[in-house]
């Protein structure tokens, strides 16, 4: 299971939010690239970057910071937030982004996901953010009537590399991941699942390893790393030691 550190960017700075609230931010660094480099040096094999302003404004807003981050780190980077058009997908691919995360557009413009998977095989990740099991969109400001598992089912077989599944109620709260919800979601799809939301300790990593067999192939963690309740190098070591054979693969 891969442990993936998150670098959320707002106004060019590295921040963390509580439950996606843009008004409840904590600034951890004026230099997102430096934070990403720190996580890479700790052993991260992939950095998860979110353009928070882009998610709200529906188009990239932190390209300068993201470009600098990509140039600085020597590991693959995946980017999400504000990706609504195929031209944006192409731009990020040309920029050197290893994986491009499509979230809200998967609900409103599903053809974008299909086209992106066709043009960039193995590089498209579906971002599904759930509030009480229902898909949230537009930077989590709107909740639909679509069940998270139903949205995932729409893209079975189109070549999506993975699904980033976020439990909004747990995001940034350090209350532990919602294991039953993650397991149920992973069981419902053949696509590899990367869990996000609530991870704060090594025990949480162990808990996720317990459902790895159902296709949970990675975990994204942010605030716990910045607050120091989770050591990235230790988490990576524990996750690697707990790896078991699975039919799904994040890679």
Swiss-Prot record:
Per the record's keyword annotation, is Ribosomal protein included, yes or no? Answer: no
Q: Which UniProt keywords apply?
A: Amino-acid biosynthesis, Cytoplasm, Histidine biosynthesis, Isomerase
State the name under which the record lists this protein: 1-(5-phosphoribosyl)-5-[(5-phosphoribosylamino)methylideneamino] imidazole-4-carboxamide isomerase
- Naturally occurring in which organism (per UniProt): Desulfosudis oleivorans (strain DSM 6200 / JCM 39069 / Hxd3)
> Which terms in the Gene Ontology molecular function aspect does this entry carry?
1-(5-phosphoribosyl)-5-[(5-phosphoribosylamino)methylideneamino]imidazole-4-carboxamide isomerase activity
| CDD domains associated with the record | HisA (cd04732)
Where in the cell? Cytoplasm
Catalytic residues at 8, 129
Task: Name the family.
Answer: Belongs to the HisA/HisF family.
Pathway, according to UniProt? Amino-acid biosynthesis; L-histidine biosynthesis; L-histidine from 5-phospho-alpha-D-ribose 1-diphosphate: step 4/9
The record's HAMAP family line, in alphabetical order, gives:
HisA
Q: Which reaction does it catalyse?
A: 1-(5-phospho-beta-D-ribosyl)-5-[(5-phospho-beta-D-ribosylamino)methylideneamino]imidazole-4-carboxamide = 5-[(5-phospho-1-deoxy-D-ribulos-1-ylimino)methylamino]-1-(5-phospho-beta-D-ribosyl)imidazole-4-carboxamide
Keyword Repeat appears in the UniProt entry: no
Any one annotated GO CC term: cytoplasm
The record ties this protein, via InterPro entries, to:
Aldolase_TIM, His_biosynth, HisA_bact_arch, Isoase_HisA-like, Isoase_HisA-like_bact, RibuloseP-bd_barrel
Q: Output the PANTHER family linked to this UniProt entry.
A: 1-(5-PHOSPHORIBOSYL)-5-[(5-PHOSPHORIBOSYLAMINO)METHYLIDENEAMINO] IMIDAZOLE-4-CARBOXAMIDE ISOMERASE
UniProt cross-references to Pfam families, sorted A to Z: His_biosynth
User: One biological-process term from Gene Ontology?
Assistant: L-histidine biosynthetic process
EC annotation from Swiss-Prot or TrEMBL? 5.3.1.16
- Top EC class of this enzyme: isomerase
């Amino acid at each position: 299971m891969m442990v993936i550190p998150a670098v959320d960017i707002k106004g060019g700075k590295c921040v963390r939010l509580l439950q996606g609230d843009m008004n409840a931010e904590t600034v951890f660094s004026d230099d997102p690239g430096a934070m990403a480099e720190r996580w890479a040096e700790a052993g991260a094999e992939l950095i998860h970057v979110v353009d928070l302003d882009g998610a709200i404004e529906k188009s990239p807003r932190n390209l300068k910071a993201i470009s600098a981050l990509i140039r600085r780190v020597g590991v693959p980077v995946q980017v999400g937030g504000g990706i609504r058009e195929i031209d944006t997908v192409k731009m990020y691919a040309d920029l050197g982004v290893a994986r491009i995360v499509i979230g809200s557009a998967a609900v409103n413009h599903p053809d974008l996901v299909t086209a992106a998977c066709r043009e960039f095989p193995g590089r498209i990740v579906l971002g599904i953010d759930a509030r009480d099991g229902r898909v949230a969109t537009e930077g989590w400001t709107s909740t639909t009537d679509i069940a998270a598992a139903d949205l995932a089912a729409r893209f079975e077989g189109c070549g999506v590399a993975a699904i980033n599944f976020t439990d909004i109620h747990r995001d940034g709260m350090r209350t532990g991941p919602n294991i039953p919800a993650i397991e149920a979601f992973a069981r419902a799809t053949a696509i590899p699942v990367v869990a996000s939301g609530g991870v704060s300790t090594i025990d949480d990593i162990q808990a996720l390893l317990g459902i790895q067999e159902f296709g949970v192939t990675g975990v994204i963690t942010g605030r716990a790393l910045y607050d120091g309740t989770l050591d990235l190098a230790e988490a990576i070591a524990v996750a690697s030691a707990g790896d078991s054979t699975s039919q799904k693969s994040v890679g």
